[in-house]
Curated annotation (Swiss-Prot):
This protein's name: ATP phosphoribosyltransferase
Catalytic activity: 1-(5-phospho-beta-D-ribosyl)-ATP + diphosphate = 5-phospho-alpha-D-ribose 1-diphosphate + ATP
Quaternary structure and interacting proteins, as annotated: Heteromultimer composed of HisG and HisZ subunits.
Highest taxon in the source lineage: Bacteria
Pathway: Amino-acid biosynthesis; L-histidine biosynthesis; L-histidine from 5-phospho-alpha-D-ribose 1-diphosphate: step 1/9
Keyword check for Magnesium: no
Biological function: Catalyzes the condensation of ATP and 5-phosphoribose 1-diphosphate to form N'-(5'-phosphoribosyl)-ATP (PR-ATP). Has a crucial role in the pathway because the rate of histidine biosynthesis seems to be controlled primarily by regulation of HisG enzymatic activity.
Amino acid sequence: MGKVLTMAMPKGRIFEEAAGLLRQAGYQLPEEFEDSRKLIIDVPEESLRFILAKPMDVTTYVEHGVADVGIAGKDVMLEEARDVYEVLDLNISKCHLAVAGLPGASWGGVAPRVATKYPNVASSYFREQGEQVEIIKLNGSIELAPLIGLADRIVDIVSTGQTLKENGLVETEHICDITSRFIVNPVSYRMKDAVIDEMAQRLARIIEGEETS
């Protein structure tokens, strides 16, 4: 068995898509991999260890070296700005960051309020637009903010738009497209460059094949 590579994976939808991509790339993951309730999963046959983390924490684990590599959404990378290498766009978990609010609602006051779990991204975006806003940090149920008068607008991830629609909100501005990325700890890359390069190349072949098919 070679050097064990530790990979941080986000729990939830991205995890399932990423596991499927790893299998397509030829990694033999156990059948119960996606259904496991463990937070650390060892796959000795592939010299792999997986750490299952909250999506917003993956870049932290990779930056601090407890994981050599990881899979993280571009939204998290933009918000956290961690010291990691972004090696590959995996082209999975496609969505986008957007501004949304109640239809026909006007901006309120001198500094309208914007609720989001991406305060850094939102601040940067509105600064670039030349708009002064007050950012309100929330950790979930962002769509609730305009409905109860907490904020004039929200900045959040939009996938199908169904959640916005169900809450009577409309998208007003498209900020940027989001996909999941293969990221690497800089020190780990110096120590385990061969095995990391192999994983990146195997994943890249699958992605390139899907794009040309």
